[in-house]
Amino acid sequence: MKQPRLLPALLLALLMLLPAGCGTQTTGAPQQTPTPTETATVSGAAGTLRVQVPDGWKYELCPAGSLTVSDQAFGVKIWPDSGSDSCVQLYWSDSFGVCGTGLKEKSLTLAGDTASAGYYDGSKNWTFLSYQGKNRGIVAWANPNAPWFAAQGEQVLAVLDTVEWEPAA
């Protein structure tokens, strides 16, 4: 008598466990990058910096003297429209240096050239990217603990891959 009830009970248990296997998985697959809709352009004595800002993201142009990095630094602050005041500062500077304590660096290819990504104290998220080669002098600085950074880090890299640097003649 108990056998006819066992099959429906097993099927019901299986159906209840099935949705548990359908959750979001974190894989190495990149997130879909928003389509760039606007080019942010800022110029200074050293040249012109351009970057594509995706739809749904905000930016602020920062002329020379408006960043705390140096009087000559100029660039663009970029952030997703997430309600956070934390941003990525993308800028040109005549000098760039960081503290080496707890720093691990990895080499990336961005905007057709090499960039050095700096990770502090075992963080999975980078704190800075320093462009080399044709884009030397361009730096991206971020707060790796910003609430949106971990979820949208791939999108940030896609944005930073659109950097164009035109040195002054």
Residue ranges and their predicted role:
Residues 1-10:
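Bacterial N-terminal signal peptides that target proteins for export
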Residues 10-16:
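Hydrophobic helical h-region of N-terminal Sec-dependent signal peptides
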Residues 18-21:
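C-terminal motif of bacterial Sec signal peptides marking the signal peptidase cleavage site
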Residues 23-25:
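Bacterial signal peptide processing site
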Residues 28-49:
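N-terminal low-complexity, Pro/Thr/Ser-rich intrinsically disordered segments
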Residues 35-41, 72-76, 109-118:
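Short, hydrophobic/aromatic-rich segments at coil-to-beta transitions
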Residues 43-97, 120-129:
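Secretory pathway targeting signatures of secreted, lumenal, and periplasmic proteins
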Residues 95-151, 157, 168-169:
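Signature of long, low-cysteine stretches enriched in small and polar/charged residues
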